[in-house]
Amino acid sequence: MSEGDADGGGREIWIEKYRPQTLDDIVGHESITERLKQYIAQNDLPHLLFAGPAGVGKTTAATAIAKEVYGDDWRENFLELNASDQRGIDVVRDRIKSFARASFGGYDHRIIFLDEADALTSDAQSALRRTMEQFSDNTRFILSCNYSSQIIDPIQSRCAVFRFSPLGDAAVDEQIRIIADTEGIELTDDGVDALVYAADGDMRKAINGLQAAAVMGGTVDEEAVYTITSTARPEEIREMVTEAMDGDFTAARSQLETLLTDVGIAGGDIIDQLHRSVWEFDLEEREAVQLMERIGEADYRITAGASEQLQLEALLAALARGNET
């Protein structure tokens, strides 16, 4: 990497620098983008609901729609709000209504993009539904959420619903290599594999991880990636679980302590990695089901506010105890 790039591309954020500008540029969701392009071509854009995990292209798709519909005027006709930052009924009543009432450039409608709409309260969603009805002649709403089940049915019934799945490994791999080549970064194959694993289908996380590792200077390899992303290596997760299932709780607990304290991995992230690793173990189906149940119980309790370390230790203890008989 050149000296001028040593601070990560002149401090430019790569997720913005390499954000797809058109629907055709979006990778991994071709069936969705084709339907969206048909709506635009027919000048028949409905209200839209994009559901799916973070970093899979929901915001990018909404922005690309605005750019294709309005061209250079897209900023004046596109309002983006983040419901998790601006919760409550006032968002719906004030900002959305004032934008929906205005017009710019003689277009048939404007677009309001409400990100993380599942963070809105039930009252706010009900108000949003009424606003959607009131301004349906000149405004199109695009809502994004992680979980469509958190969106009230009256809103879902007014939208065309698109479900964005996590991106495939090949799509993330390809994009990471393109960015590394463009930025002049020396990126090893095991570094790519580590970024793909750490991202788990989240392109934003993969690109952020690449930039963070590149800022450190030198070659971006798996060691740099796992360190900068605070991700456990797959073999470390396997070793910890194998030790527990072999009845060596002390060794498994020591490995857990290393991951939590020395490496600095959050308990919730360890749970996610455990869940991803279940089928990599040589387990009978009954054993795999039991392990999945224990992971689910620990995840539920951690989400409810219980101690991450205590719940993970209890999970390992249950595995060790279950294999003593």
UniProtKB/Swiss-Prot annotation:
InterPro entries: AAA+_ATPase, ATPase_AAA_core, DNA_pol3_clamp-load_cplx_C, DNA_Rep/Repair_Clamp_Loader, P-loop_NTPase, Rep_factor-C_ssu_arc, Rep_factorC_C, RFC_lid. GO terms for molecular function: ATP binding; ATP hydrolysis activity; DNA binding; DNA clamp loader activity. GO terms for cellular component: DNA replication factor C complex. ATP binds at residues 52-59. Belongs to the activator 1 small subunits family. RfcS subfamily. It comes from the Archaea. The keyword Nucleotide-binding applies. This is Replication factor C small subunit. Part of the RFC clamp loader complex which loads the PCNA sliding clamp onto DNA. One of its GO terms (biological process) is DNA repair.
